[in-house]
């Protein structure tokens, strides 16, 4: 054990930058970095039961500010995607008439109400006032026609914005529940409640499968990409609702997933390793050194040029056939396909290797926690009672391993020519690629060292050896944290920062991991929700 740690100390000069000598300073820097990104929770979990309260608080704010009914407030908020600041801005800058008009609201003028009790839809006359219903716009029709209108719209999924039946009236009718069956009324209310999530850019359903029923609300309305953890345990990107994929941008991750799932690389492999039969066009793979090929359909052809030939041949030639001119474009196409295939294989292999390591280390984490708990109960040493150091190390391993895995798709697109062909010269691309891969390699080496130390049977060590292991793990954990931080700074400032396009923003690095969304409480709701 001691000899092993001596060798580790000898390696530290190569793996540890000099500024990492002061461990307390490193931990302080990591905490300060997290505080810079978030001093308060930036997201909230809204349970299915709390959705009504979350929606109600925003409705009340609009109702009080504009002196409108709940129905009118909801219609306005749906129009402006539940963005109260935007709604108030339109009201302040352009007035109430413009605000109402855009949302399909009409101020009721009693003088325009017809005196006759006739329904202009079914043309039935002499109806009692109890058989007719007037909407906020002032238009009045019989209850049967309203019921039919509401029933059709609700069943067609248009319950959130049911317009008045009157000709050219765009007023939104919100009184459906009083005129339809109990079942449809519940469905209508569900549409209105869910609109708080589905029409709201700052609130999204947790993408868990099966669905946990929670929604996540982004408190800070700054447009930045962020990652969040729902109370159900799922971590995901709030912007694209995919799994957490930082340091990849949402577009990079979307393209990478598609590339891994579709047949683009299979096509490249087929181009490199097979030739199409000139008769039936089926792909043929070469298995030996002879250039004479025979398809199952009976067609003979030359492997080198793909042209149809006769049957007679020797190992070195085919009777009556000589390959034509050098087909430069076909050769270039073949070389390009081979190069693309090799490049994709290189990055995918490393991405997959780290994903597989994460799965194995999940078992390691459970084993370590079990050992730590058992030792804290059976041993009297202080170090076993306080084993947060090893939990911190395991969590750091998981966070850094995941960052490493997603850094390979990032490199694939950052330094390829699919997205940034015109953003960098070849020379600049190579320089930046080498610098980034140096950082990536340094992080990778320290992550593997962290993983190796965590595999040690610390539960079998005496007190002195455990203290020594704790010291090494604590230092290495801080090193890995700082390397992750430096990688993100490089990506944000040196790689993505100079680009003109702003579509490749990434979620910020957080030393303590992805933020767990706070529990929603009505008093904490903000106006821009």
Curated annotation (Swiss-Prot):
Keywords: Metal-binding, Repeat, Transferase, Ubl conjugation pathway, Zinc, Zinc-finger. Residues 1-23 are annotated as: Disordered. Zn(2+) 5 binds at residues 277, 280, 295, 297. Zn(2+) 4 binds at residues 237, 240, 245, 250. Residues 1-22 have a biased composition (Acidic residues). Signal peptide: none annotated. It is an enzyme of class 2 (transferase). Zn(2+) 3 binds at residues 206, 212, 230, 232. Might act as an E3 ubiquitin-protein ligase, or as part of E3 complex, which accepts ubiquitin from specific E2 ubiquitin-conjugating enzymes and then transfers it to substrates. This is Putative E3 ubiquitin-protein ligase ARI4. It comes from Arabidopsis thaliana.
């Amino acid at each position: 054990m001691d000899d092993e740690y001596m060798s580790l100390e000898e390696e530290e000069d190569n793996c540890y930058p000099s500024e990492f000598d002061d461990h307390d300073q490193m931990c302080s820097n990591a905490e300060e970095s997290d505080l810079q990104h978030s001093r308060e929770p930036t997201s909230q979990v809204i349970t299915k039961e709390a959705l009504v309260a979350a929606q109600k608080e925003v409705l009340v704010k609009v109702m009080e500010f504009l002196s409108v009914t709940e129905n009118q407030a909801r219609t306005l908020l749906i129009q402006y995607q539940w963005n109260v600041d935007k709604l108030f801005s339109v009201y302040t800058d352009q007035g109430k008439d413009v605000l109402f008009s855009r949302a399909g609201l009409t101020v009721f003028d009693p003088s325009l109400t017809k005196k006759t009790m006739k329904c202009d839809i079914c043309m039935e006359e002499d109806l009692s006032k109890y058989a007719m219903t007037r909407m906020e716009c002032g238009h009045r029709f019989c209850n049967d026609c309203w019921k039919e209108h509401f029933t059709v719209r609700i069943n067609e999924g248009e319950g959130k914005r049911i317009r008045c039946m009157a000709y050219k009236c765009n007023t939104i009718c919100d009184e459906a529940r009083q005129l339809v069956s109990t079942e449809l009324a519940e469905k209508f209310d569900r549409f209105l409640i869910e609109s708080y999530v589905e029409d709201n850019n700052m609130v999204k359903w947790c993408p868990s499968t099966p669905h946990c029923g929670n929604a996540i609300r982004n408190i800070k309305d700054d447009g930045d990409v962020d990652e969040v953890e729902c109370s159900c345990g799922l971590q995901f990107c709030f912007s694209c609702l995919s799994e957490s994929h930082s340091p990849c941008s949402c577009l990079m991750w979307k393209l990478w997933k598609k590339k891994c799932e579709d047949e683009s690389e299979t096509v490249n492999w087929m181009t490199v390793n097979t030739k199409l039969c000139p008769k039936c066009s089926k792909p043929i793979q070469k298995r030996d050194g002879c250039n004479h090929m025979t398809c199952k359909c009976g067609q003979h052809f030359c492997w080198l040029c793909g042209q149809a030939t006769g049957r007679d041949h020797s190992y070195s030639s085919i009777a009556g056939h000589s390959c034509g001119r050098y087909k430069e474009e076909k050769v270039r196409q073949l070389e390009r396909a081979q190069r693309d295939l090799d490049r994709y294989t290189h990055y995918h292999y490393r991405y997959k290797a780290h994903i597989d390591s994460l799965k194995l280390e999940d078992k390691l984490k459970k084993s370590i926690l079990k050992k730590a708990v058992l030792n804290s109960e059976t041993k009297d040493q202080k170090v076993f009672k306080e084993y947060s150091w090893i939990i911190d190390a395991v969590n750091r391993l998981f966070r850094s391993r995941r960052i490493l895995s997603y850094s390979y798709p990032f490199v694939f697109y950052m330094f390829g020519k699919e997205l940034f062909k015109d953003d960098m010269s070849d020379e600049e691309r190579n320089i930046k690629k080498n610098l980034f891969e140096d950082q990536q390699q340094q992080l990778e080496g320290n992550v593997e060292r962290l993983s190796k130390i965590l595999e040690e049977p610390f539960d079998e060590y005496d007190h002195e050896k455990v203290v020594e292991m704790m010291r090494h793990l604590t230092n290495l954990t801080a090193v890995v944290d700082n390397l992750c931080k430096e990688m993100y700074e490089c990506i944000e400032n040196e790689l993505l920062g100079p680009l003109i396009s702003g579509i490749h923003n990434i979620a910020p690095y957080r030393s303590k991991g992805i933020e767990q969304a706070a529990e929603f409480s009505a008093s904490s709701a903000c106006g821009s929700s």
